[in-house]
Amino acid sequence: KAESRGLGDVYKRQSHGAYKFSRKPDGDILAMDVIEKIHKKIPKTHLVMHGSSSVPQYLQDLINNNGGEMSQTYGVPVEEIERGIKSGVRKINIDTDCRMAITGHYRKIAREKPAEFDPRKFAIPASEEMEKLCADRFERFGTAGHAKKILVKSLDQMAQSYSKGELKQI
């Protein structure tokens, strides 16, 4: 059976949100070799990378160029996340990147069109940026095109499957 484990120990200094690292992370900060060692010992264990937003520079710039005051910060490089995926990581949290995409575009509209008050005029470009970001991550993380493999079940059906031990590793 596959199990899921969080990897708080992989970050030698774990942090969440936008302010993860004050410099581009390397082996002194990210212990990706730990993920690889875990995967070799227990290859059917699914791993989780909490707080793995990449905190893209272009989104920091979008926010700051439109009135924001984000201090320079660095996230988990997408290349390192891809490396983790090759070693059993199956869940990656990128919420901060999504929030940065939304915030950057809200700020841009507010700066460029200060008379604008219709939230749809803010939400549409913000949502488009987040969609672009997520599509990139789906491609890079190898998940694009797999939706048809997902069997849709109701919450009650899932609860019954769990209680009967019917769920199988795919």
Predicted regions and their residues:
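Conserved, mostly hydrophobic/aromatic
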Residues: 8, 50, 84
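Single conserved hydrophobic/aromatic residue that forms the stacking wall/gate
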Residues: 1-7, 11
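Active-site beta-loop-alpha junctions enriched in small/polar residues
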Residues: 13-17, 50-56, 75, 95-97
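Short, well-ordered coil/turn segments that N-cap beta-strands
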Residues: 5, 43-46, 90
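Active-site-proximal beta-alpha loop/turn segments in soluble metabolic enzymes
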Residues: 9-25, 58-59
